Each structure stands twice: as structure tokens, then as C-alpha cells.
């Protein structure tokens, strides 16, 4: 007589959902960092390899997907890029506005004693926009090597339109190459639990969170504002678009995109994850192959919050009065700066001096604010990236679902 044994914990995890495997990796990473710091630092290599693999595959994935979708686009077939772009810009401005309200409700101050003399921020918003435009005319090989997604998008779109006039064999080859790269991406994503395990272990072992307690209130305002945008503002925008309960979609995007982005701390590395989620949601490939890399470049709600909150914290510290029109102008400036954050080395933090300049704050003090940003960066950057990246796929899904509903209603009326 044979007896049936219930599958063990390891077997259940191995054959369970990827989210459960990531949660297991997270818990094991925390335990290892608590038990042995040297061992935790050593397994950090696993996290570095995982993030490196995602960053390596993301540029070629964007190039091939966008090129294939445009080359094989059928005449008359509609994409939803325009409404998604509008949602990106509206979401970023709404986040900056929420950050202003949050900062007025819970004013924070800083200990401006750190220095950051070795960092060179852009001198003005014109320089930020110039860098963004110049990245469009980058050499394609250089764009792929450096992960310049604006340049990659421009070349992919141009080549895609050119290949529309090619023969079917060429189009099929491009499509097959796109599928091959997608397969490689899925392979890399399967190693996410191991990567998260390494990232969490090394972060807790090398950095810890003791330095963050000195900036507890500032972090509460920053993270609280990001949670407000993720769980209140974004759902309102999605409801406005799809006219039904937005929370199943919002929570799905936070769980399956935001969790990855929180630990990788890279919107570029999360592009393959978002692409896979869009495929899982059965969204239009012609749309998401363009909107996801575009969102990783310009959809920066988290960056807008960081710029606004830290700037107003500096303003409060120096006792500078701020009226309502100035606060609204700061929201606009923070939104524009956030959209250009991908074109600046150091991202949102190095755009803080631009916003500080509005209030006549000297560059020396502004750079001390940037230094504070780097101190709290362990948590701030993780939350910012999670919000930015999950919003890319959220707004893409909302626009695609709204278009599907419109077509279905139109078919019923006819």
C-alpha cells in the first residue's frame, strides 16, 4: 500500500506564484542579514547580477518590441499612446500638487550640515530640456550601451516606420527577434526571488536603517505622500478613465510591478517586468511596447514628490514664506523637472537645486538638501521607483481597457 505525502514547503514554493517566491526571498534576506552580516554582504552579488541582467536585456527589448510593433502595424489599427501620455503628465502634476498639500499640512525641516561639493547639478531647466532633446539624436549603439531610452525609442520608431515598406520576410524576422528577446526576459524574471534575496540581504547588512531615524518625519511625509498618490490619486485617475472599481487593477500593478521596482530601484530594469505584466493583462502590444519605455522616461510622479517635498523642507528650514500661487508654480516646475529626471545623472535629487532656485536659495544650501536626499535614498529611491514604474503599467492598462470598453459599447449600439 502506498501513502500519499503532502508536498513540502520547498516544493510548494518552487511551483507556486512568483509573488510568493519573492516574498520568501525577502524574508530569507532579512533573516540572513540579521544572523550574519558578512554572509549577507557576500550574497549581495546575486542581487547585483539580477539587476545587471535586467538592465542588460531592457534596451534591446525596447528596441526590438517597438520596431516590431510599428513595422507590423496594420493600417487603420488604433493605438492609445495619446491618452496614456496625457495620463502620464496629469499623474505627475497631480503628484506634485499632492506633495505641496502634504508639505503644508506636515511641514518638515532639515539639518543642513552635509556637503555635496563633488556633485554638479544642471544650471537650469533649459539645460535639463536640452539634455533630453540631445539624447534623442544619440548614436543608436551608444544609446543601447548607456540605456538611453529616449534615443532607443527614436531609433526604434524610425526603423519601424522604414520597415513598414519592407517585404513580409523581413517583418517576420523582426517579429521573431522580438519574440526571442521576450523569451530571454521571461527567463531573467524567473530568477527574481534569488535576486531580491541578494538585494535585501546586502542592503540591510551594509546600510541598515539606523541613519534614517534622524530624518523620520521627512521620510514619513515623503513615503506618506507617495502612498497617497498610489492609493488615492492614481485610483481616482483610473476610475475617471475606466468608470469602474479601479482597486483590483491598482493593487495588481503595485504587487506585480511595484514590488520588483522597490528592490531593483531602477525604472529601466523594471521595463521587462512591466512588459510581461502587460502581456499577462492581454493589453494591445502595439500600445504597451511604446508606452512602457516612454513611461520609464517621462512618467515620474515619485520624482515630482521628492523634488517638491525636499524643496519645501528647505524653504521651511530657512523660514521663507510661501504663498499659494508660488506653491502652484512649484508644482508645475517640479513636474517639468521630474519629466526630465531620466536625462540627468543622479535623477530627481540633482534637480532639487532648480526648484530651490525659485525661492532664492543658494546653490551651497541646495546641494546640502541633495546630500540629505542621498542619506535617505535607501528608502526614498525605492518608494519613488516603485510608484513611478507601477504607474507606467497602471495608466497603460487603464487607457487600453477604456478603449476596449468604448469599442464594445459601440459594437452593441450598432
Swiss-Prot record:
It is a multi-pass membrane protein. The keyword Zinc does not apply. It catalyses: L-serine(in) + Na(+)(in) = L-serine(out) + Na(+)(out); L-threonine(in) + Na(+)(in) = L-threonine(out) + Na(+)(out). One of its GO terms (biological process) is serine transport. The chain crosses the membrane at residues 16-36, 46-66, 84-104, 143-163, 180-200, 218-238, 300-320, 332-352. Residues 37-45, 105-142, 201-217, 321-331 are periplasmic. Keywords: Amino-acid transport, Cell inner membrane, Cell membrane, Membrane, Symport, Transmembrane, Transmembrane helix, Transport. Its main location: membrane. InterPro entries: Na-dicarboxylate_symporter (IPR001991), Na:dicarbo_symporter_sf (IPR036458), Ser_Thr_transp_SstT (IPR023025). Residues 2-15, 67-83, 164-179, 239-299, 353-414 are cytoplasmic. GO terms for cellular component: plasma membrane. It is found in: Cell inner membrane. Pfam families: SDF. Coiled coil: none annotated. GO terms for molecular function: neutral L-amino acid:sodium symporter activity. The keyword Nucleus does not apply. Involved in the import of serine and threonine into the cell, with the concomitant import of sodium (symport system). NCBIfam families: PRK13628.1. Belongs to the dicarboxylate/amino acid:cation symporter (DAACS) (TC 2.A.23) family. This is Serine/threonine transporter SstT.
